[in-house]
A protein has these predicted regions:
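N-terminal secretory/targeting leader peptides
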Residues: 10, 14-227
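A gly/proline- and charged-residue-enriched helix-loop-helix capping module
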Residues: 1-11
Length: 227
């Protein structure tokens, strides 16, 4: 977080105030047959998969799929018409947007949490008095904690609502859940290290950037980025 705060200030002239996230990003596929109960990540090879970010696109290409950028509002007709075979989005947003009407399976590989942030113009922040800064810091920290708790709750709700329920938001979606196997987890680690992280490190561009990632997120995740 300290590294992000520094980059916000130096690159964008902004004060980072909050980091929060949307529900976990997962795969939703139209496999055509709900009797399918297992589906390894290796079978995604050749599939057209909706994405919305470079990093997720790297993952899709890493498993042999074809990344297709489609606006969220256009995903349902794209899945319905076969423009895409699968889509990536948050597990509760997928339910709310009725993806369950056009897909059969939810592959429960968590590919991140669509991180978001709240920031303020740094000059404006620096112009505030100490009491106002303290007010923002306290209440935004409280709000951030509440939002992370809400994300966890929404993950739980989305997991149930997309499958057989019970669903507090309406009709259960009836998707067939695909639970990652040990083989899938090994595939995921390989793809992250050899596609996602390698390409990210190249975009990041400096050894300092890569080293800072390795010293923070890398230590927690047990993975290492390299240029």
């Amino acid at each position: 977080r300290d590294i992000l705060a520094r980059e916000f200030e130096q690159k964008y002239g902004a004060k980072l105030l909050m980091i929060y996230a949307w529900p976990s990003q997962q795969l939703f596929c139209n496999l055509g047959d709900k009797s399918i109960k297992s589906y390894p990540l290796s079978k995604l090879k050749g599939k057209k998969i909706r994405t919305y970010s470079t990093t997720l696109g790297d993952f899709i290409e890493g498993v042999g799929g074809s990344a297709v950028t489609i606006a969220f509002a256009e995903v349902v007709p794209a899945l319905q018409k076969g423009v895409a075979d699968c889509g990536l989005t948050g597990i509760l947003p997928a339910y709310n947007a009725k993806w369950w009407q056009v897909v059969t399976h939810n592959i429960r590989v968590k590919l991140g949490y669509a991180s978001s942030f709240l920031a303020m113009n740094l000059k404006v922040w620096n112009g505030l008095d100490s009491d106002t800064k303290a007010f923002f810091n306290k209440h935004l920290a409280d709000l951030e904690e509440e939002m992370w708790a809400a994300t966890a709750k929404n993950d739980e709700i989305g997991t149930k609502c997309n499958a057989a329920g019970p669903c507090p938001k309406g009709e259960p979606g009836g998707m067939v859940p695909i639970i990652p196997t040990a083989e899938d987890k090994a595939t995921l680690k390989n793809v992250v290290e050899n596609f996602v992280l390698k390409r990210w490190a190249k975009r990041c561009g400096t050894q300092k950037c890569v080293d800072e990632w390795n010293e923070t997120i890398g230590k927690i995740s047990g993975m290492k980025a390299s240029l």
